[in-house]
Amino acid sequence: MKKLRLSESGARGWFIGDFPEAVVRTKDFEVCWQGNKAGHIDTPHYHKVITEVQLVTAGRMIINGEEFGPGDIYVSEPGEEYRAHYLEDTQVVAVKFPSVPSDKYYI
């Protein structure tokens, strides 16, 4: 067994996936635990290959005009454009599959 810290793994909470800092390295999927501050608005983007699933564990956010809160899940399919606006300090668990760290295209 290993004991590790999230702060010692990948950027922005990504701790499983196909990148050197991952605590488990795999090309199959990526996992992160991430917090975003109230008022933050992501740059709109999409993925060509991956599907991304986010579970909101705390806080509230709007993605493409739809409000999400604790227990809500968002699924983004390849090619779907989206942007998150955080209404409150928000925490999410996100999974992307497959793991293709370069598959993010800003609009």
Model-derived segments and their meaning:
Residues 5-6, 64-83:
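Short acidic-glycine-tyrosine-enriched beta hairpin
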Residues 31-35, 53, 73-75, 94:
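Conserved hydrophobic/aromatic beta-strand scaffold that supports enzyme active sites
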